[in-house]
């Protein structure tokens, strides 16, 4: 709905009927009439369609392949939700279209996180700017999300959930979890350009203007080749 003022038409999707009902109520309360709501998983509601802009906040919580809470759990293992969105989004971008995606990825032994995220993107056709804004250790990550669902990590339930989660991380050599943004731009059939960076300082300014400048600079440099 935040995109309604910045676009001629908007298609908003969600897997959960209740979420769409809340969205419809908000639209009516704010006299928004250029948004179409569709129900379905991932990109299924927009199969075969392409867009000038994609904004996605998928259920990217990193954990076991199960769904405890629809708003945050994808049912995919570890960072599979972010992987799926990054693999599918380029195929739904119109020429020069852009995607702005929130996501998480695991840091595993013997694999740089940059290589992991880059491996999910196509070898041709996208300019990608990946910004990692935070990294936490497994213990902090698990306790944060347990508290998110009002479970005290010190309770019996909390201890059991913590051990299952941490054991799963250990079994997959996960030593940290990163979080941030992935911004994509369609560049036709040109070789993909992927830049992964880390924000090591507090960032409070709007990121939109910075992303706009990044893609503008990248296009200028591409034209110099």
Name what the model sees in each region.
Residues 162-171, 197, 201-202:
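Glycine-rich, charged/polar anion/phosphate-binding loops
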Residues 189-225:
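Acidic, low-complexity/disordered tracts enriched in E/D and polar residues
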Residues 133, 185-187, 199:
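Structured loops at beta-to-helix junctions and adjacent beta-edge loops in soluble globular domains
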Residues 9-14:
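Conserved SAM-binding motif I beta-strand of class I
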Residues 126, 148-152, 174-190:
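Core SAM-dependent methyltransferase catalytic element
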Residues 15-156, 160-161:
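S-adenosylmethionine
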Residues 121, 171-176:
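A general structural signal for short secondary-structure junctions and capping/turn motifs
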Residues 1-7:
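Conserved SAM-binding loop of SAM-dependent methyltransferases across substrates and taxa
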């Amino acid at each position: 709905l935040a995109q309604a003022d910045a676009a001629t038409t908007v298609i908003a999707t969600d897997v959960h009927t209740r979420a769409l009902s809340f969205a419809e109520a908000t639209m009516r309360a704010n006299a928004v009439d250029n948004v179409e709501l569709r129900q379905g998983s991932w990109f299924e509601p927009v199969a075969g369609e392409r867009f000038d802009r994609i904004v996605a906040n998928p259920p990217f919580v990193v954990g076991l392949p199960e769904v405890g809470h629809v708003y945050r759990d994808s049912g995919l293992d570890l960072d599979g939700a972010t992987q799926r969105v990054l693999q599918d989004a380029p195929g739904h971008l119109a020429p020069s279209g852009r995607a702005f995606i929130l996501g998480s990825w695991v840091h595993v032994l013997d694999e740089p996180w940059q290589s992991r995220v880059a491996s999910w993107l196509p070898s041709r056709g996208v300019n990608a700017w990946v910004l990692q804004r935070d990294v936490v250790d497994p213990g902090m990550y698990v306790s944060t999300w347990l508290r998110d669902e009002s479970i005290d990590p010190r309770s019996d339930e909390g201890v059991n959930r913590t051990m299952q989660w941490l054991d799963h991380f250990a079994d997959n050599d996960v030593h940290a979890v990163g979080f941030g943004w992935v911004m994509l731009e369609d560049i036709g059939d040109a070789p993909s350009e992927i830049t992964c960076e880390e924000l090591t300082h507090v960032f409070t300014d709007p990121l939109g203007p910075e992303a706009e400048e990044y893609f503008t600079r990248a296009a200028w440099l591409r034209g110099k080749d």
